[in-house]
């Protein structure tokens, strides 16, 4: 590697590769400073959050597909699990959460495509992603039973990735706090 750069690789929670990078007197070139640097970092944060939201929508969609497929094929008491109304209602709730997440993710992506990097739009999307991902992930694992957590079955991998996304660049609480702090006209807020 480069002089003064130490890299220590590791595996992340969702089985991806990560690395700790330590810069010790490494040669550097300043790309920006002051407000310009702050704006560049803010924009990268928004772009990354929006990309993670889109990735999460895909992971939630696949977790739901696997769950519905499992309910249609797994038999218990001589019938498929899909014949139990309570389970199909839970799968329908998962679908609603997925579509809420997809809608806000698409809105955040569209806002960026129009040339606006809005941290409030990104936080709205990330908050819904965190909430939907947690519920969809928990339901997918629960409806699959023990097989859902095995390394051989893919739904657990999607849930692990959703968990990692939920904690990257702020969890649900951090984004809810950002949104609450952005309110300037409390008369417009309806509680109750």
Question: Can you name each region flagged by the protein language model?
Answer:
Residues 57, 61-64, 91-101, 105, ...:
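Alpha-helical transition-metal enzyme core signature, strongest for iron centers
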Residues 15-19, 46, 83, 121, ...:
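A generic structural signal for well-ordered coil/turn residues at beta-strand boundaries
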Residues 68, 72-79, 95-128, 141-146, ...:
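C-terminal helix-coil-helix/basic helical segment that borders enzyme active sites and/or dimer interfaces
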């Amino acid at each position: 590697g480069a002089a003064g750069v130490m890299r220590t690789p590791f595996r992340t929670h969702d089985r991806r590769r990560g690395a700790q990078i330590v810069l010790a007197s490494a040669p550097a070139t300043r790309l920006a400073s002051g407000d310009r640097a702050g704006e560049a970092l803010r924009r990268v944060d928004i772009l990354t959050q929006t990309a993670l939201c889109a990735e999460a929508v895909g992971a939630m969609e696949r977790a739901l597909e696997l769950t519905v497929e499992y309910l249609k094929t797994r038999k218990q008491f001589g019938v498929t699990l899909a014949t139990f109304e309570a389970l199909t209602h839970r799968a329908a709730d998962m679908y609603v959460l997925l579509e809420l997440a997809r809608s806000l993710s698409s809105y955040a992506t569209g806002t960026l495509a129009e040339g606006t990097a809005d941290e409030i739009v990104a936080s709205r999307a990330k908050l819904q992603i965190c909430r939907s991902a947690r519920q969809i992930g928990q339901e997918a694992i629960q409806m699959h039973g023990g097989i859902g957590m095995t390394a051989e079955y893919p739904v657990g991998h999607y849930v692990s990735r959703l968990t990692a996304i939920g904690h990257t660049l702020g969890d649900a609480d951090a984004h809810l706090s950002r949104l609450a702090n952005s309110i300037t006209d409390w008369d417009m807020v309806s509680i109750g």
